């Protein structure tokens, strides 16, 4: 993006400059990207073998593809200093009041509850690697509307999921599509 495109914008980025302690997670992967990390994520999610195979193939593609050079300088990214899976809660809540307080505080800072009340028919709130809150208007659910996070869709509709997952932007598309396909969550 050119400087001209952003020079007149008055954006306060400090609003989003916060993070939580890693001690609050019910599960946190080791830092670093490896075949073992990819396997750990799949095992934590109790995924079918085909998904583990997809993840591992995507990881191999990621390792072989060069860093893109068409955008900003990404050479300083340390892929071994990243947690690729962090689970903040043991379950997905249907009532916002039941979401853990530390997670609610983060979403309150971002204005998520207000956005749902004002504009959305359904919402899934993802915190780190997992969905912690999921809501769909009852009238839409009765009409057969499916609104699921990807983890639940994989469980509830495995054939549909397998048919469409990773098709629009396949892991072969670019290095970061491959990374996403290897370690996706939520």
Task: Show where each model-derived region lies.
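Glycine-rich and polybasic anion-binding loops at the starts of cofactor/ligand-binding domains
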Residues: 2-186
